[in-house]
Design a protein with these regions (language model features):
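N-terminal accessory segments
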Residues: 1-151
C-alpha cells in the first residue's frame, strides 16, 4: 500500500501508524512466535475506541484484511496479516478492580501480568495462563492453561 493511501488513516487516528517505509517496521510487525513472518501493510497503535473504529472503517472501505494484536502470542500468527492492517491494542491496557463487586474491568490490550498485579493487590487470583506477556484479549478468545486451570476430564 502506498504511503499516500495511508494518509487518510494517519489523519483519522490519534495513535501511531507504522508502515513498510518506516525504520521501525520490522520491530513493529514482530510476533511472539519468531517463525511467523507476516508483512502487514500497516500497524495501527490504537489509543482508544475511536482509533479502533476508524481503523476498522478504513480497512473495510479499502477491502483490507484485518488482524487484532493484543500480546501477539497466538502460535499460528493470527495477530498479524500479510498486506492487511494490524490493530495493535497494547496502549489500551487499563485494568480496574472493584473489590466490593469482586469484578475486574480489563481493556483489550492489557497483558496477563498487568491483570495479575492489579488483582493480587486485592487478594484475588485470575484463573488464566502463566505467561505474563500474553494479551488478555487473545487469552479470553483463544484460551490458555495456567496454575489455576481445572484439571482432569
Amino acid at each position: 500500500m502506498a504511503i499516500s493511501a495511508l494518509e487518510g488513516l494517519t489523519a483519522a487516528v490519534k495513535g501511531r501508524v507504522v508502515d513498510r517505509g518506516d525504520s521501525g517496521y520490522d520491530e513493529a510487525r514482530a510476533l511472539y512466535n519468531g517463525m511467523i513472518d507476516k508483512h502487514p501493510a500497516a500497524i495501527v497503535y490504537c489509543v482508544g475506541e475511536a482509533d479502533v473504529s476508524a481503523a476498522i472503517g478504513f480497512a473495510r472501505e479499502r477491502g483490507l484484511r484485518l488482524a487484532v494484536r493484543c500480546g501477539g502470542h497466538n502460535g499460528a500468527g493470527l495477530a498479524s496479516v500479510d498486506d492487511g492492517l494490524v490493530l495493535d491494542l497494547s496502549s489500551m491496557n487499563e485494568v480496574t478492580v472493584d473489590p466490593s463487586a469482586r469484578m475486574v474491568r480489563v481493556q483489550g490490550g492489557a497483558k496477563l501480568g498487568e491483570v495479575d498485579r492489579a488483582t493480587y493487590e486485592h487478594g484475588f487470583a485470575v484463573p488464566a495462563g502463566i505467561i505474563s506477556t500474553t494479551g488478555v484479549g487473545g487469552l479470553t478468545l483463544g484460551g490458555g492453561v495456567g496454575h489455576l486451570s481445572r484439571g482432569g476430564a
